[in-house]
Amino acid sequence: MPKRRARVTRKTKETDIAIELVLDGNGKYEIQSGIRFLDHMLESFSKHSRIDIALTCTGDVDVDDHHSIEDIAIVLGSAISQALGDKRGIQRYGWAIIPMDESLARAAIDLSGRSYLFFDAVFDRPTVSDLSTEMVEHFFFSLAEHLKANIHLEILHGKNTHHKVEALFKSLAVAMREAVKITSNEVLSTKGVI
């Protein structure tokens, strides 16, 4: 079976982004988002989802991190959606509960063709390194919207903001790895399409 791949670019007055990914990868990554902590989160996402990701972003981070973070989530969601094609054979659902030291995150995803985000996490710090924590939820919202997926993310408990954010990215990565897995040759929907 050929590997499922995608390439997406997005150029606006605020950002210039290119992504190439392989769903059936090994978790190899080359990430240059312009936001160091986001690089770390996307590297973790790639490694634990086993999705190979090459991403570059030139953005107006001198203004703030909003445009780059939002647009990166848009291209990531679009690229995964493109690589999934008609979603024939995918498991469709995935879930994970992942610890990161004292923090525990739960993620569930349905690659349903419908966008929805449930997000329940509170961060005690306004930033982690150069990432605004208010943008964590917005990243996942934009990802869900452009992936056309239901995503549920929760911090069940935790104290350290870095650990909470990383646990969210890792739990979604593991859930995604399960959801994109090929398990049959049919579309997992009574409608016949996803």
UniProtKB/Swiss-Prot annotation:
Entry keyword set: Amino-acid biosynthesis, Cytoplasm, Histidine biosynthesis, Lyase
Primary localisation category: cytoplasm
UniProt pathway: Amino-acid biosynthesis; L-histidine biosynthesis; L-histidine from 5-phospho-alpha-D-ribose 1-diphosphate: step 6/9
GO biological process: L-histidine biosynthetic process
Keyword hit for Magnesium: no
One GO MF term: imidazoleglycerol-phosphate dehydratase activity
Cellular compartment(s): Cytoplasm
Keyword Lyase attached: yes
Alphabetical list of PROSITE patterns matching this protein: IGP_DEHYDRATASE_1 (PS00954), IGP_DEHYDRATASE_2 (PS00955)
Highest taxon, organism lineage: Bacteria
Cellular component annotations (GO), alphabetically ordered: cytoplasm
InterPro entries in UniProt: IGPD_sf, ImidazoleglycerolP_deHydtase, ImidazoleglycerP_deHydtase_CS, Ribosomal_Su5_D2-typ_SF
SUPFAM superfamilies noted in UniProt: Ribosomal protein S5 domain 2-like (SSF54211)
EC code(s) of this entry: 4.2.1.19
Known catalytic reactions: D-erythro-1-(imidazol-4-yl)glycerol 3-phosphate = 3-(imidazol-4-yl)-2-oxopropyl phosphate + H2O
Residue stretches spanning the membrane: none
NCBIfam families: PRK00951.2-1, PRK00951.2-4
HAMAP family on file: HisB
Family the entry assigns: Belongs to the imidazoleglycerol-phosphate dehydratase family.
Name of the featured protein: Imidazoleglycerol-phosphate dehydratase
